[in-house]
Amino acid sequence: MGWWRETIDIVKENDPAARNSLEVLLTYPGVKALAAHRLSHFLWKHGFKLLARMHSQFWRFWTQIEIHPGAQIDSGVFIDHGSGLVIGETAIVEKGVLLYHGVTLGGTGKDSGKRHPTVRKGALISAHAQVIGPIEIGEKAKVGAGAVVVSDVPSDVTVVGIPARIVRVHGEKDEPTIHEVEEKRKYYLDKLEHAREASHHSSSL
């Protein structure tokens, strides 16, 4: 009962509308989707890939939440509402992450191997945010509603917009610090893009 208890408790901690454990267990689609994913992921890891996909697609129909059975999701994750949420095959979601409806943890279609995001402990991804590619969302970072994130987000910052930009660091609107962090982020993003372009060029020769 450890996983169930932890999952129900995190819902009650984060959703004031959750009145009791039975209500959470019976009526919250995020809880059902995460529970189903545990079996899908087990089947996937043990080589029953078609069965895993069929199982995950069945629960996609019932919950409107699509989680690829290959995705790695820790315990203590909260999916609120959940409708339209998509988590790709190589995504990693750590403990204490909050995901809202319409979120996509997706791929660019250009990467191979690790193609989807890693979301570190305690991060929050708001409704309809699109987090794309093999990037990392740092611990306790917050991604605003409708943001499009295509590069790493440092720990304990808030990003908003298209493309996402940093607006708060450690909960404060400290302009010099925000500017410094953004400059570093852009520098490393440019280096990463150049490395990817060089890799694609060499592979096409």
Please tell me what each predicted stretch does.
Residues 1-63, 174-205:
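Terminal amphipathic alpha-helical/low-complexity segments used for targeting or macromolecular assembly
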Residues 60-167:
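Structural signal for interior beta-strand "rungs" in well-ordered beta-sheet cores
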Residues 123, 173-174:
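Intrinsic disorder/low-complexity segments
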